Amino acid sequence: MRRPDPCQERARELCLAAGIDPESRVGEGRGQPAWCLYRDAARKEKLAREADAASSEIAMLRPQEERFKNAPLKVFGEHDAATIKQMRNCMAVGNVVSGVICADGHLGYAQPVGGVIAYEKQISISGVGFDIGCGNMAARLDVRFDDIRATAPTIIRDVAKVISFGIGRKNIEKVEHALFDDGDAWRESDMEAYRQKATGQLGTVGSGNHYVDLMRDEAGFVWIGVHFGSRGLGHTSATRYLKAAGGKDGMNVPPAIVDEDSELGRRYIAAMQLAGRYSYAGREWVVDRVRQIIGGKVTESVHNHHNYAWRETHGGKDLWVVRKGATPAFPGQRGFVGGSMGDDAVILEGVDSPEAKASLYSTVHGAGRLFGRNEAKRRFTREEMDRWLNERGVTLVGADLDESPMAYRRLPEVLAHHAGTVKVLHTLRPFAVAMAGEGEFDPFKD
């Protein structure tokens, strides 16, 4: 039996207020009721109300020291009220020095995706999130696109056969890595019991917006781009430590903060760092495996996390900077940022400027969503998505409508909001994309 839609009534009201019959049909074929176009707006209103309610719960937590109250928040781009409120709620707990919302930001679990918070001697477990160490890697090959243009569809299908996509998958091939021999790292993080499972999942990609892209740069050279994180290891670590810290799982919940010098804090930091190393190892393995399929050698590579906590110095202070869906961009530091499926990606570099300092040397991790996953499935069809990709010469293997490029902002528009903080070194145009297929559900993929 289908559950009632809590946003339907408000969506119908918004539709009527716009002078449209809620039951009129819109879209191709049989279409859908017009009120469905207003459901996302109704959902955001609901989330904003929940964020207001969460403020009361946050006020009942341990009082925030006066010197950490009203910490500055730098906002890039435009965001809905629910996202801003969620960020303010996060910054009302713990030793917060400053915060940032990047231009691709949107609501996330406990903290906005695209949200950056600097803490003094503390870390937010919920801020780092469930996919610890999620990030991007891109590698340039000494192979030209013109040399593989004709075989590109076959290459990406071979990639989809060799690399495991989806939830809970194991690697088709046995992968050995020195990380699994580092007994101290597994013991200090209290994750020893999960070592064997993690061994089997290293090099698997997952679902949702996680991908393997083949792209070409301005000079015509081929790049491999990948996006995924620490798989089941990171999710298990986050779940265990979130529970141990008394935190909650959800959108509008107080952040789970731990002191760096507490026993729980030390173990969580060890677990986070282990998951970060695991993420790096997995992405490096996938890139090299795809390189073997294409041929050639790597001539340049860029690699970064965007779900992690870093020990950094800002304004002369030693801080923990928690980035959830945000790319580190210190002066001279390079990063790989993907667009939506089929859109251009970029290799960028941080610059030194007052705006960059205010951003905590952080930038976007992608184009950012316009519509939630369920909303995207209601609004767009597979035919529309395939046509959009075909017009751009992109071969797609897998993916579902929730990753439709129409559900995302355009990356150049998002990056424009960060002007003066980063510069683009390369623009990468995709020609083949591999992702998990339809029906894969992963609530923590972002």
Give names to the regions the model predicted:
Residues 2-55:
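Amphipathic alpha-helical segments in structured regions that serve as interaction surfaces
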